[in-house]
Amino acid sequence: MLSASTMKEVVYWSPKKVADWLLENAMPEYCEPLGHFTGQDLINLTQEDFTKPPLCRVSSDNGQRLLDMIETLKMEHHIEAHKNGHANGHLSIGVDIPNPDGSFSIKIKPNGMPNGFRKEMIKIPMPEPERSQYPMEWGKTLLAFLYALSCFVLTTVMISVVHERVPPKEVQPPLPDTFFDHFNRVQWAFSICEINGMILVGLWLFQWLLLKYKSIISRRFFCIVGTLYLYRCITMYVTTLPVPGMHFNCSPKLFGDWEAQVRRIMKLIAGGGLSITGSHNMCGDYLYSGHTVMLTLTYLFIKEYSPRRLWWYHWICWLLSVVGIFCILLAHDHYTVDVVVAYYITTRLFWWYHTMANQQVLKEASQMNLLARVWWYRPFQYFEKNVQGIVPRSYHWPLPWPVVHLSRQVKYSRLVNDT
């Protein structure tokens, strides 16, 4: 909340001060359309302004929340200016009337009220208490996690099913691939890919623990990664490609032994689907690459929800992702088309989801909103309907004890909000 002295200067606010006030009140989505507004422009905003661009494209509540905050700002300014009670024109003083015996009687009250005041009813409009702009809603996050987990389990089941259909490499040799024509296979390259992937997942998990709005952001991660693996189940099943290299040693086919298939599926789940853990020795899960999905998606989330000033951190994560994807191809463990399709679907789904989540108008189905035609739009509305605006890149210390600053030995609890 702004101080009373600052309230007196609202009309003199600079555009930067207006932007700071918007961020303090958790309304970062207005910073860009109101970027040139001064304090005077801010308090002159009306309902009509929200019916015209650009404000009509920012808010789905017709700017009601911002207008309520501006009304509160005006009232605090007014109350501060008249807090002593002598500038409102309602203070009147009684008159002492002498008695016939020369003494003075009690004061005659001009309005019949004690102390010379008159009673009036003043109606002050106050904004109604509002819910948090970024509610945690852990129940929805749990539902999104179960969705992602179900899609991951379904993917492992599908890998086991497709493995039974892969033709032997002696019968159906690898398909021609331009990358394989120009780069010889490097045996250890796939291990580098999986190590890079584990590093990126670890960095993202650590970053997630420090996020203030971790429930909302993890919900988005689970929704996107679950949908990507669901798509992967479909592409693997409809088209079974031969192994991409003669170096593959696929595990024997089980020919309907469901008990052995269940054990194989559980082993794959326990090992995280990684070859480096010895859990993945099945073939057929080529179109498209799950490793590329994780390398790309973790980088996108790390960059999206970390401060812009940490450019070096973004470059390190980008390098880990690119090297990992290149090593997939260098190991000849996926066709080039597997990697290209995985990258395309992952980036587009991430960008579509976040564009829709950051624009309130896109959360409402209409004839003009063509994005509302995607099959996952209803679940998206359910998960995102209570999130108002762009989620700030806010961080806080998650542990019960404060951080100790070593250079000054000062204890503090840190909260960073970098938008």
Curated annotation (Swiss-Prot):
Pathway: Sphingolipid metabolism. The chain crosses the membrane at residues 142-162, 190-210, 221-241, 282-302, 310-330. GO terms for cellular component: endoplasmic reticulum membrane; Golgi membrane; Golgi trans cisterna; plasma membrane. Major sphingomyelin synthase at the Golgi apparatus. Catalyzes the reversible transfer of phosphocholine moiety in sphingomyelin biosynthesis: in the forward reaction transfers phosphocholine head group of phosphatidylcholine (PC) on to ceramide (CER) to form ceramide phosphocholine (sphingomyelin, SM) and diacylglycerol (DAG) as by-product, and in the reverse reaction transfers phosphocholine from SM to DAG to form PC and CER. The direction of the reaction depends on the levels of CER and DAG in Golgi membranes. One of its GO terms (biological process) is sphingomyelin biosynthetic process. Disulfide bonds: none annotated. It is a multi-pass membrane protein. It comes from Rattus norvegicus. Residues 13-76 form the SAM domain. This is Phosphatidylcholine:ceramide cholinephosphotransferase 1. It is found in: Golgi apparatus membrane. Pfam families: PAP2_C. It catalyses: an N-acylsphing-4-enine + a 1,2-diacyl-sn-glycero-3-phosphocholine = a sphingomyelin + a 1,2-diacyl-sn-glycerol; 1-(9Z-octadecenoyl)-2-acyl-sn-3-glycerol + a sphingomyelin = a 1-(9Z-octadecenoyl)-2-acyl-sn-glycero-3-phosphocholine + an N-acylsphing-4-enine; N-hexadecanoylsphinganine + a 1,2-diacyl-sn-glycero-3-phosphocholine = N-hexadecanoyl-sphinganine-1-phosphocholine + a 1,2-diacyl-sn-glycerol; N-hexadecanoyl-(4R)-hydroxysphinganine + a 1,2-diacyl-sn-glycero-3-phosphocholine = N-hexadecanoyl-(4R)-hydroxysphinganine-phosphocholine + a 1,2-diacyl-sn-glycerol.
